Amino acid sequence: MAKEVSKVVKLQVKGGAANPSPPVGPALGAAGVNIMEFCKQFNARTQDKAGKVCPVQITVYKDKSFDFVVKTPPAAVQLMEAAKLKSGSGEPNRKKVASVTWDVIKAIAEDKMVDLNAFTAESAMSMIAGTARSMGITVTGDSPLKK
């Protein structure tokens, strides 16, 4: 028989750097999870993503055991990394802060494909390009997307 789910907690934590302080501690403490056990498992699983923001979905069961799934870093974080930015534009329609090429968009889309709600690489690229546009990042070069 399957375990009964008590709660699902979603967090964004830097890879390899989970510790019991906020936001991890309070969120998991309220769910009754052994915080140190989660931190050890998360840090071991995300050593290769050290320093990058990693969304994680933690499923807590009635017996206080847990499972978690680490997802790919958010598209906005990957775009800022590619464009060497600290933050996006406050006024993306008026003030453009950087530019990236379609090759960068394609690389990010391929990386995020498992987490995106897209069936084709083109639709994933369109989503990533939209995220870039909303951050004040222009996409340069000829668009490989169908018109």
UniProtKB/Swiss-Prot annotation:
Domain of life: Bacteria
GO annotation (BP), single: translation
Reported modifications of this chain: One or more lysine residues are methylated.
InterPro entries noted in UniProt: Ribosomal_uL11 (IPR000911), Ribosomal_uL11_bac-typ (IPR006519), Ribosomal_uL11_C (IPR020783), Ribosomal_uL11_C_sf (IPR036769), Ribosomal_uL11_N (IPR020784), Ribosomal_uL11_N_sf (IPR036796)
Quaternary structure and interacting proteins, as annotated: Part of the ribosomal stalk of the 50S ribosomal subunit. Interacts with L10 and the large rRNA to form the base of the stalk. L10 forms an elongated spine to which L12 dimers bind in a sequential fashion forming a multimeric L10(L12)X complex.
NCBIfam families named among the record's database cross-references: L11_bact
Stated name of the protein: Large ribosomal subunit protein uL11
